[in-house]
Curated annotation (Swiss-Prot):
PROSITE patterns: DNAJ_2, DPH_MB. It is found in: Cytoplasm; Nucleus. Belongs to the DPH4 family. GO terms for molecular function: metal ion binding. It holds the Pfam family DnaJ. The keyword Zinc applies. This is Diphthamide biosynthesis protein 4. Required for the first step of diphthamide biosynthesis, the transfer of 3-amino-3-carboxypropyl from S-adenosyl-L-methionine to a histidine residue. Diphthamide is a post-translational modification of histidine which occurs in elongation factor 2. The keyword Nucleus applies. The DPH-type metal-binding (MB) domain can bind either zinc or iron ions. SMART domains: DnaJ. InterPro entries: DnaJ_C/III_chloroplastic, DnaJ_domain, DPH_MB_dom, DPH_MB_sf, J_dom_sf. SUPFAM superfamilies: Chaperone J-domain, CSL zinc finger.
Length: 168
């Protein structure tokens, strides 16, 4: 389990939501929001506040420290991926062939543990799948969309054709 994120709390109470800021905010935005939230939720002014001073302070300490914020953002992304939420804007998480384990039998195949359900090697495809089902991506590469065999997660895999001339 990630140290900062409980899966059940992801969407309702992220540190960004506690302070009322967006993930792209800067330190000045964080400091300003922190002061506003402390004043708005101070027990003397608002005894029924749903946001506690402790959660405001924890959010501030995490987001104001660049290293802690990076760790928090990484854990937030991993937690969101486990739940299968869209983080790329087109509805699919994007991976590259290097993210997969390659097995060479009669035909090359690529395998990956599902980032959502964590089932081992449940996302898989073969070289023939790349040839038959890959589509050009407009950036001199190709995409293929594959599904986990254990859950409903679909992902996009980016890959590039290797020219034999480049290898010589």
């Amino acid at each position: 389990m990630d140290p900062y994120i409980e899966d059940r709390d992801i969407q309702k109470r992220s540190h960004y939501k506690v302070l009322g800021v967006v993930p792209t905010c800067n330190d000045l935005d964080i400091k300003s929001a922190y002061k506003e939230m402390l004043l708005a939720h101070h027990p003397d002014k608002n005894g029924n506040a749903s946001t506690t001073i402790n959660s405001i302070q924890e959010a501030y300490k995490t987001l104001i420290d660049p290293e802690l914020r990076d760790q928090y953002d990484d854990s937030l992304k991993r937690s969101i991926q486990r739940q299968g939420f869209n983080i790329t804007g087109d509805g699919l998480d994007i991976y590259c062939l290097d993210d997969f384990e390659m097995e060479e039998e009669e035909e090359c195949k690529w395998l990956k543990d599902c980032p959502r359900c964590q089932f081992p090697k449940s996302i898989k495809f073969k070289e023939s799948d790349l040839i038959e089902n890959g589509t050009e991506d407009g950036d001199n590469g190709f995409d293929i969309i594959v599904q986990c065999e254990s859950c409903s997660l679909w992902i996009k895999v980016k890959y590039y054709e290797i020219n034999e001339e480049d290898d010589e």
